[in-house]
């Protein structure tokens, strides 16, 4: 996944930087809340139940964003698109970790660590090219 951003106009919400549509942002944020509510770890089966509830429009939550702030709403999101556009990118970027042995999803800090490493790689490349950084 590619993250393009304008450093002078960064949104306050990191989900707006990572995900391209408001609906993706809402679903990704709800997934993280769901993981937190389940002690930061859920099984593959529970993830499938979450995706199915979204697909059937039965997932209820209270949103933090206008115009639905504070209201209980039912979210609907296609199951295939959930896996393709939300879960898979979150795994590949290090926001969520999947343990192949335990078959569980957990919240991960790898994303933050990788961004720091990318910044260091950028500085190293500039120095290698002769720039004073």
Residue ranges, per PLM feature:
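Conserved interaction-surface patches within small, structured recognition/assembly domains
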Residues: 69-80
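Short, amphipathic alpha-helical interaction segments positioned at domain boundaries
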Residues: 110-133
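Minor-groove-contacting beta-hairpin "wing" of winged helix-turn-helix DNA-binding domains
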Residues: 102-109
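A short, conserved structural fragment
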Residues: 87-102
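Long, low-complexity, charged/polar intrinsically disordered regions in eukaryotic proteins
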Residues: 1-40
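DNA-recognition alpha helix
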Residues: 43-71
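Short, hydrophobic-biased segments on the C-terminal half of alpha helices
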Residues: 79, 84-88
């Amino acid at each position: 996944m590619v993250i393009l951003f304008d450093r002078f106009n960064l949104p306050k919400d990191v989900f707006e930087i990572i995900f391209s549509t408001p609906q993706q942002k809402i679903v990704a944020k709800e997934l993280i809340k769901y993981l937190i509510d389940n002690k930061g770890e859920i099984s593959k089966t529970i993830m499938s139940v979450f995706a199915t509830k979204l697909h059937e429009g039965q997932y209820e939550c209270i949103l933090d964003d206008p115009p639905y702030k504070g209201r209980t709403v039912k979210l609907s999101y296609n199951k295939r698109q959930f896996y393709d556009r939300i879960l898979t990118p979150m795994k590949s970027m290090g926001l969520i970790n999947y343990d192949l042995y335990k078959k569980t999803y957990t919240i991960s800090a790898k994303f933050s660590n990788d961004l720091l490493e990318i910044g260091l790689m950028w500085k190293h490349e500039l120095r290698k090219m002769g720039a004073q950084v």
